[in-house]
Each structure stands twice: as structure tokens, then as C-alpha cells.
């Protein structure tokens, strides 16, 4: 049982030190994907608008 507690303690210390960084990284990945998708869509729309105005 003491080995388990020791492991748990080490895991908790690691989480306290690096948990925020890990969570932030995951959030950035998730948000980044969404933002990236939106940015791509915006770029496509802008591209279409620019091409449309050039034709006229």
C-alpha cells in the first residue's frame, strides 16, 4: 500500500507542477484546430470575394 501511496504522491506532485502546462497544451490544440478551421474558412471566403471583385 505504501508503494501505491508513494506513486500517487509522485503523480500528484507531477500533476501540480506540469498539469496546468499539459491542460494549456491540450486547450491550445483543441482551440487551435477550431481557430485554424475558422481561419481557413475566412481565407477561402476572402479569396472568393477577391476573385469575384477582380472579375468585375
UniProtKB/Swiss-Prot annotation:
The keyword Ion transport is annotated on this UniProt entry: no
Superkingdom of origin: Viruses
GO cellular component terms, A-Z: host cell plasma membrane; membrane
Biological processes annotated in GO: killing of cells of another organism
UniProt keyword list: Antimicrobial, Cytolysis, Host cell inner membrane, Host cell lysis by virus, Host cell membrane, Host cell outer membrane, Host membrane, Membrane, Viral release from host cell
Localization of this protein: Host cell outer membrane; Host cell inner membrane
Function noted in UniProt: Disrupts the host outer membranes during host lysis.
Protein name: Disruptin gp28
The species this protein was found in: Escherichia phage phiKT
